[in-house]
Amino acid sequence: MLRVILSVVAAVGVVATMPVAAQQSAGPRVPLVQDDTSDPDAQALFKELRARGTSPLNLHRVYGNAPKLARATLAVAQALRYDAIVSRADKELIILRATQLARGDYQFGQHRRLAISCGITVEQIDSLPQWRDSKLFSDRQRAVLAYADAMASAQGVDDATFDAMKAFFNTKEIIELTMNAAYYSASSQISRALRITAEGNPKGGGYGTCR
């Protein structure tokens, strides 16, 4: 019996000292709600997703454990995507940088596909960590990236960075970009805390395409 207890304690200790990335590979911390769920709200959530042309992703199946909140949250995501005037390419660029800074691997992976379909190049995406030294970005894109960096910093957005945004975007567009960066930064925290893992190549194109 003592030997069994010591083995369990040792195993727990190994998990506790594992790097975050290794722990995340263990999979989601909460159940993935399946299609045959008896919860009518979760069923409604999945039905709405399929009506939009995508199968429920792991993110949605985790959210399905709190389906009413999930539907409200995803309604915000839909509004950010489709009810905005700022270009999809600019939105995807700030989302990529915001999720990268928030270490949201799940969201970054999904939006990488979206960004490419919106005209962001693979070379640009790969150079995001060193974007300040890159010649691949326009002045407009550099203003967006600097804004994302400032939003994620402890110091916040300074006047010079905000003024650079005003040179390319009107007030509504700046608010839309700000909300996209903030929303997906928060979503990244959720996916990290709950260890939401990628699906590989999901049916329905993941988060969709630039349309």
Residue ranges of predicted features:
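N-terminal secretory signal peptides that target proteins for export/translocation
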Residues: 1-2
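Bacterial N-terminal signal peptides
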Residues: 5-16
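Hydrophobic alpha-helical segments
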Residues: 14-211
